[in-house]
Structures are given as structure tokens and as C-alpha cells.
């Protein structure tokens, strides 16, 4: 097992020094979802939620979250992101309406963007919940996970189905 990199010689937390790492193009895709009622699905689809356009606001929240990840994840380095894309797709089955969220993040730097993608996916789902909770508080935020990543010393990763 490799040694922990986020502890100093005194056993206290530290931010890892990445100054010797080569800057490369790095990408990450993270996913999340939220299950809503038919009523919420209809209201989102017809832009009838009182707080505004749910998907537009959630998309912007996801982008903002990716940019601010280092403010809420203690050992995360601040990064200059090259791009963040938040997309949505509906999956419907037997009166269940699941909003699928996919976030793609890209940078050119010395560390990966997995945490930025995961944070953005989470914030996007949370924003949908916040905007729709006046209609129904029983929404369920689903699993949030890394789908794939490219670049860096550890190489590429693709989640197995």
C-alpha cells in the first residue's frame, strides 16, 4: 500500500507539492442523478417552477462549483479550468423520472480534475433539489461517481459498467 501523501512529518495535514509534476491535458467526467415525481418532471419540462429555469440554474451552479472546488475540499489545489460542460438527460420508467447529470471538466495542469467534476455533479443535483423542494421534498439524489478521467501520472480510467 502506498504511503499517505497528505500528511507532513508530524502527521498533520498538508497540501501535496505538485510543482515537479508535468503539466498535461487532463479531463474528467462525473455523473449524478436525481429522482423526481411526475409533477416535478412536468413543471421542469414546462418551465413552471417558481424559482425559474431549473436546468439553466443547475447548469450554472455546476459550473460555479467546479471553479470553486478548492474552497470546499481542503486538500484540493486551485486549478485554472479550461472548460466545464454540464448536460442533462431524462430517464423515465414506471412513474419514476430520473434526471441524469453528466459533467465534463478539462484543464492543462499538474493535477487532475476528478474532484472538480464530482463536486460539479453533486452541486448540480443539489441545485435541482433546492429549486424544486417547494413542490415535493421526497426527491432522491442518486449515486455520484467518476465515469472516466484522462491524463496524469496514474493514467486513464474508465468506469466498468
Swiss-Prot record:
Pfam families (alphabetical): MoaC (PF01967)
Molecular function (GO) terms for this protein are: cyclic pyranopterin monophosphate synthase activity
Binding positions for substrate per the UniProt entry: 75-77, 115-116
Role description:
Catalyzes the conversion of (8S)-3',8-cyclo-7,8-dihydroguanosine 5'-triphosphate to cyclic pyranopterin monophosphate (cPMP).
User: According to its UniProt record, which reaction does this protein catalyse?
Assistant: (8S)-3',8-cyclo-7,8-dihydroguanosine 5'-triphosphate = cyclic pyranopterin phosphate + diphosphate
Give UniProt keywords alphabetically.
Answer: Lyase, Molybdenum cofactor biosynthesis
Native species: Bacillus cereus (strain AH187)
Taxonomy of origin reads:
Bacteria, Bacillati, Bacillota, Bacilli, Bacillales
Which residue ranges traverse the bilayer? none
Q: What class of enzyme is it?
A: lyase
The similarity annotation says: Belongs to the MoaC family.
Metabolic or biological pathway? Cofactor biosynthesis; molybdopterin biosynthesis
* Protein's GO biological process: Mo-molybdopterin cofactor biosynthetic process
Q: What name has this protein been given in UniProt?
A: Cyclic pyranopterin monophosphate synthase
Signal sequence, renumbered to the chain? none
Please indicate which superkingdom the organism of origin belongs to.
Answer: Bacteria
E.C. number: 4.6.1.17
Positions of the catalytic residues:
130
Amino acid at each position: 500500500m502506498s504511503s499517505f501523501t497528505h500528511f507532513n512529518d508530524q502527521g498533520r495535514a498538508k497540501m501535496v507539492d505538485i510543482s515537479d509534476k508535468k503539466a498535461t491535458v487532463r479531463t474528467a467526467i462525473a455523473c449524478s442523478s436525481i429522482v423526481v415525481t411526475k409533477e416535478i418532471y412536468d413543471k421542469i419540462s414546462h418551465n413552471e417552477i417558481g424559482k425559474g429555469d431549473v436546468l439553466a440554474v443547475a447548469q450554472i451552479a455546476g459550473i460555479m462549483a467546479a471553479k470553486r472546488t478548492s474552497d470546499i475540499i481542503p486538500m484540493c489545489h486551485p486549478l485554472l479550468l479550461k472548460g466545464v460542460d454540464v448536460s442533462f438527460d431524462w430517464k423515465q420508467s414506471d412513474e419514476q423520472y430520473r434526471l441524469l447529470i453528466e459533467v465534463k471538466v478539462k484543464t492543462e495542469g499538474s493535477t487532475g480534475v476528478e474532484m472538480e467534476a464530482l463536486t460539479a455533479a453533486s452541486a448540480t443535483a443539489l441545485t435541482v433539489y433546492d429549486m424544486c423542494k417547494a413542490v415535493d421534498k421526497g426527491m432522491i439524489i442518486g449515486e455520484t461517481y467518476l465515469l472516466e478521467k484522462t491524463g496524469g501520472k496514474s493514467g486513464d480510467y474508465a468506469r466498468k459498467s
